[in-house]
């Protein structure tokens, strides 16, 4: 990991895939890698824990993330480069703003190149900003994220505010008092977002009936794979359980996760094996036992696939992990 200067309420770092569990403020996540190639992702975070945050990540790896968002805050994610990623089942597009309400269980498929700015504030503060900017408060279901795509002119105006605002907050981060509560620049930025959202199309762009169906199919299949990870899961069985053809399943997985069903199952098994291997020294588990626990029967192939995805052998993961 290469670090740039970090301060108590500010960090600007480059992280590998294993370190991305805290890349989103207010949202600790479980990360599963989806492909072997990666470069360090740049993560900039300015925050006053529990009060507000501004995240500016640029990801350079493919992964699946799942986590529960803060029960008292709302996140407004302004997408700069989408690169085929999805958040909460919403296919992202450039210049889209995704609103994630408090307490949402967030699922995301991140593709290399995704870049966004996420502002996190208490729900009550966002309601006040909406009321002042638009004269109305938008009711949001606790578990229902939404998205609008901004007009080009509004999107450019929003983008122009982000970097200067982040630089200003970084400079002020040596004085915790200045950043304890949402700064005026952040409030003005959120006001501009509220205005832009109010005049944008309020339907959820990209969520056509067919796209929504494919997302539901892929997520149902993902749940089934998790529940039966110790078992053999041929694609025929998966299709039968979900009630779709092999072609439909293939399309649903590539549209949602960017990989085939077989590649997804293999990656999920390898990621689960990695989690178990990091505690294997304390629990006394062997590489063979861990592989069997996640439904892997070909140990030679397992070692090669594991090294390809994580850059080290299963035994190296065990030895590198700290004993409890």
What are these regions (language model features)?
Residues 254, 293-297, 307:
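A short, basic/aromatic helix-end/turn motif that makes direct DNA contacts
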Residues 68-84:
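Short, conserved beta-strand element in jelly-roll/cupin
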Residues 36-40, 44, 48-69:
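Conserved short histidine dyad/triad with adjacent acidic residue
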Residues 249, 253, 301-302, 306:
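Short hydrophobic/aromatic patch on the recognition helix
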Residues 255-256, 308-309, 320:
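Alpha-helical DNA-recognition elements
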Residues 2-34, 38, 84-229, 234-236, ...:
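Alpha-helical bundle regulatory/interaction domains
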Residues 263-266, 270:
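An amphipathic alpha-helix adjacent to DNA-recognition modules
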Residues 58-63, 79-83, 100-104:
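Short acidic (Asp/Glu) patches
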């Amino acid at each position: 990991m290469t670090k740039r200067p970090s301060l108590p309420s500010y960090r600007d770092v480059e992280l590998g895939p294993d370190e991305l569990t805290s890349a989103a403020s207010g949202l600790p996540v479980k990360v599963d890698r989806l492909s072997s190639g990666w470069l360090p992702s740049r993560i900039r975070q300015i925050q006053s824990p529990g009060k507000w945050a501004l995240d500016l990540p640029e990801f350079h790896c493919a992964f699946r993330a799942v986590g529960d968002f803060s029960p008292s805050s709302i996140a407004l994610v302004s997408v700069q480069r989408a690169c085929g990623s999805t958040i909460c089942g919403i296919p992202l597009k450039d210049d889209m703003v995704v609103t994630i309400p408090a307490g949402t269980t967030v699922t995301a498929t991140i593709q290399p190149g995704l870049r966004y700015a996420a502002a996190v504030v208490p729900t009550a503060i966002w309601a006040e900003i909406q009321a002042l900017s638009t004269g109305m408060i938008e009711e949001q279901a606790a578990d229902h994220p939404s998205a609008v795509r901004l007009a080009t002119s509004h999107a450019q105006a929003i983008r122009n505010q982000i970097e200067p605002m982040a630089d200003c907050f970084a400079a002020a981060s040596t004085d915790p008092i200045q950043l304890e509560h949402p700064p005026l620049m952040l409030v003005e930025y959120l006001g501009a977002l509220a205005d832009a959202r109010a005049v944008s199309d309020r339907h959820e762009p990209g969520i056509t009936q067919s796209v929504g169906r494919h997302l539901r199919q892929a997520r149902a299949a993902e749940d089934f794979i998790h529940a039966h990870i110790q078992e053999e899961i041929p694609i025929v069985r998966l299709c039968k359980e979900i009630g779709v053809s092999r072609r439909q399943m293939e399309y649903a997985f590539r549209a949602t996760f960017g990989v085939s069903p077989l590649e997804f199952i293999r990656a999920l098994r390898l990621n689960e094996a990695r989690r178990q291997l990091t505690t294997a020294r304390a629990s006394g588990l062997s590489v063979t036992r861990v592989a069997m626990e996640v439904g892997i029967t070909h140990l030679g192939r397992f070692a090669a696939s594991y090294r390809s995805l994580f850059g080290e052998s299963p035994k190296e993961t065990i030895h590198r992990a700290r004993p409890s």
